[in-house]
Amino acid sequence: MLSPLELAHRSLAEVIMARDLVVDATMGQGYDTVFLAELKADVVAFDVQALALDMTEKRLKQAQLSAKLILDGHENVGQYLEQPIKAAIFNLGYLPKSDKQVITQAETTLSALRQLLEMLVKGGRIALMIYYGHVGGLEERDTVLAFVSKLPQNVFQVMRYGGINQANQPPFLVMIEKRL
């Protein structure tokens, strides 16, 4: 059985072609950035922590891959991208093994998501891995779910995938695909 993150990767890989512009909105340890770069996509990755950039840069170098790494919040994505995107991925929560006070926030996540939905091409997808077992996580989860549940169904298809018999607030995936 696929984990939510494995399903996110598989769903994105179905639509991403070489040279497509894609976004890692929360680069963290760099795993998603490397995954996207392995697909030969043009990757732009964001994080507010220098540690995340350092870890991602090392992973990319080890894999002999490249991506544009930006030390800035994903809410500023519009300042860096002007062309359409094929896909994006978010891992909401905090950077493991770092300061748990530095977390993604509902307001900035919604701002980034709104901008990326506008930039998303027909058939493009956005994956949101929602980790909410930390202070502030429930608010962000509820805010994101309220927003995506109201996206017009003729324009976007929104799906939720996650375990239902797991303890300790298991993470889940929200996938969005643009229909029009």
Regions found by a protein language model. Give the residues of each.
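Conserved SAM-binding loop of SAM-dependent methyltransferases across substrates and taxa
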Residues: Q29-A41
